[in-house]
Regions:
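Short, conserved micro-motifs enriched in small and acidic residues
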Residues: 1-5
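ATP-dependent carboxylate-amine ligase
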Residues: 6-185
Length: 185
């Protein structure tokens, strides 16, 4: 919403007509082709799957606010942290998510961005120590393995937020899995 408002302000500021701005907004489709990794919503066997590239506490707060407005019987999240962030920022992401999701899958990907093996995962786990909602935490090595584990657990009516790291590759993997085992997005 904030990005759309900024775009409207910029368009108005350079003198575009309101009708042109309105048509531009009306034509925007938030899918993996037009805005990869930006709240891409898909259906997988009757469950809602959302792929997003958020990797900081502000993004987690915005994502939690958005998914709180969506139906979801059981809520799960798949997350890895970007190793080039401050320890507190990595930890705070799962502090926020731990209050909004029943199941959390932590994954470590190949690119740790200067961190030692397991260091980012440990910080994410620390953030879940006082989780008010999370009941199940799993740790998995590999982004696609984590995505597959999350998809396998989904039941109709569930909601799963997947915080992707390798955006294009993860979206292609999700698309393939959806075409193989569920309804298309």
């Amino acid at each position: 919403v904030e990005n759309a408002m900024a775009a409207v302000a910029a368009a108005w500021g350079v003198g575009l007509h309101w009708e042109t701005i309105r048509r531009g907004l009306a034509s925007f489709v938030n899918d993996a082709d037009n805005a990869p990794g930006r709240f891409n919503v898909m259906d997988y066997r009757g469950a809602t799957v959302i792929a997003d590239y958020g990797h900081n506490p502000d993004a987690m707060r915005a994502l939690v606010a958005a998914v709180d407005a969506m139906p979801g019987k059981r809520r799960s999240v798949v997350i890895s942290g970007a190793g080039d962030r401050r320890d507190s920022d990595i930890r705070d992401q799962t502090v926020i998510l731990g209050g909004a999701f029943d199941d959390v899958i932590l994954y470590q990907d190949a690119a740790q961005r200067g961190r030692g093996d397991g260091e980012v995962m440990a910080l994410l786990r620390e953030g879940l120590a006082q989780a008010s909602r999370t009941k199940r935490i799993d740790e998995i090595r590999g982004e696609f393995v984590a995505i597959d584990a999350a998809l396998e657990r989904l039941e109709p009516g569930d909601l799963c937020l997947i915080l992707v790291d390798q955006v294009e590759e993860a979206l292609a993997h999700l698309s393939q899995r959806i075409s193989q085992g569920g309804l298309s997005s």
